[in-house]
């Protein structure tokens, strides 16, 4: 239920730790997936950037995740450079597809974890639509 591209995999730049934790969450909810590659270049919001109307459920999951991170950046608890969502470490557990964020409620770490958890669960429910992989961004993401 995810988009996968193996082309250019060797060119993936090092990712912030939170991105790696997010990928672990996706692996938990979608066993056998390749999270560093999945969801890249799918729709208008999965991958870098994002604009226009999401083209499907998976793309809506990505947009909601982007929006969640944008809200975190506005949160005073997460305003320092060490607390921005892309680098903030958090703690979570995975048991048979069930994700639990374990940092204290209300902390920046917990807020970031909750965003990633919600997105990972959303991805697990989103059907894969090949037609939305590597779409023409200029014409379909208005």
From Swiss-Prot:
Function summary: PLA2 catalyzes the calcium-dependent hydrolysis of the 2-acyl groups in 3-sn-phosphoglycerides.
Residues annotated as catalytic: 65, 116
Record-level GO cellular component terms: extracellular region
Keywords: Calcium, Disulfide bond, Hydrolase, Lipid degradation, Lipid metabolism, Metal-binding, Secreted, Signal
Disulfide bond residue pairs: 28-94, 44-141, 46-62, 61-122, 68-115, 78-108, 101-113
Species in which this protein is naturally found: Bungarus candidus (Malayan krait)
Official protein name in the record: Acidic phospholipase A2 Bc-PL
Residue positions binding Ca(2+): 45, 47, 49, 66
Subcellular location per the Swiss-Prot or TrEMBL entry: Secreted
């Amino acid at each position: 239920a995810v988009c996968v591209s193996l082309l250019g995999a060797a060119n993936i730049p090092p990712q912030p730790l939170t991105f790696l934790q997010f990928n672990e969450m996706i692996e938990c909810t979608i066993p056998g997936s390749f999270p560093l590659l999945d969801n890249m270049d799918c729709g208008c919001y999965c991958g870098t950037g994002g604009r226009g109307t999401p083209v499907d459920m998976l793309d809506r999951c990505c947009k909601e995740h982007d929006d969640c991170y944008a809200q975190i950046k506005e949160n005073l608890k997460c305003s320092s450079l060490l607390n921005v969502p892309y680098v903030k470490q958090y703690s979570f557990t995975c048991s048979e597809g069930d994700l639990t964020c374990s940092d204290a409620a209300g902390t920046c770490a917990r807020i970031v974890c909750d965003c990633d958890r919600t997105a990972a669960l959303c991805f697990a429910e989103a059907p894969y639509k090949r037609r939305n992989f590597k779409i023409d961004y200029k014409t379909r993401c208005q």
